[in-house]
C-alpha cells in the first residue's frame, strides 16, 4: 500500500510447523539443537551417529519431531507414553539458542498436547530440573502445575509438571 509516499508493509506472519523425524538426514539438526542445550538438560553430548540410531529404532511408544520456523529447523521435541495409560510425556524439548524466547517452545508444547489428545491421552507430563528456569517458566506459562519433586537439594533436583488436556 502507498501512504503519503511511504510503502507500508504487512507484518510477517510467523509460521511454525512440526514434522515427525523419520530420516537420518534430519538427525544432523537434532544433534546440533540438542547438544547446544545438553548442559541445561544435564545430559552428555550425543553424537550424530547415536541420533541416527535413536531415530531409526522405530519405537512405537515414542515419536521425534523437528520444529521449524518456516523452513529453518529451530527445535526438537520427543514425546513418549503413546502405547499405555492415560498420560503422555514430553521427554525432550530443546530449542536452538538463536530462536529461544520466540514462541517455539510454546508451539512445541501445544503441538504435543494436540498430538496426545488425538491419541486419547488425558494428561501430559514433563520432567525438568530445578535449575532449568526457562523450561519451568514455559511450562507454568502453558498452564502446567507442579505435581512432584525429588529434593536432594542440588541443581539436578527433578520436578514433574502435569496438565489435564
Locations of regions flagged by a protein language model:
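Conserved glycine-rich acetyl-CoA-binding loop
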Residues: 72, 92, 96-110, 119, ...
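Conserved GNAT acetyl-CoA-binding A-motif
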Residues: 116-128
Amino acid at each position: 500500500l502507498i501512504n503519503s509516499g511511504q510503502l507500508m508493509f504487512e507484518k510477517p506472519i510467523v509460521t511454525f510447523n512440526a514434522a515427525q523425524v523419520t530420516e537420518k538426514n534430519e538427525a544432523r539438526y537434532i544433534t546440533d539443537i540438542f547438544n547446544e542445550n545438553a548442559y541445561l538438560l544435564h545430559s552428555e553430548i550425543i553424537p550424530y551417529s547415536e541420533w541416527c540410531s535413536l531415530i531409526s529404532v522405530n519405537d512405537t511408544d515414542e515419536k521425534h519431531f523437528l520444529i521449524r520456523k518456516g523452513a529453518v529447523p529451530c527445535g526438537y521435541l520427543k514425546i513418549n507414553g503413546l502405547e499405555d495409560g492415560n498420560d503422555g510425556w514430553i521427554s525432550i524439548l530443546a530449542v536452538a539458542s538463536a530462536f529461544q524466547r520466540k514462541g517455539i517452545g510454546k508451539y512445541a508444547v501445544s503441538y504435543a498436547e494436540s498430538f496426545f489428545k488425538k491419541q486419547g491421552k488425558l494428561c501430559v507430563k514433563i520432567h525438568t530440573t530445578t535449575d532449568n528456569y526457562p523450561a519451568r517458566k514455559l511450562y507454568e506459562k502453558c498452564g502446567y502445575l507442579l505435581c512432584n519433586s525429588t529434593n536432594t537439594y542440588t541443581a539436578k533436583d527433578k520436578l514433574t509438571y502435569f496438565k489435564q488436556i
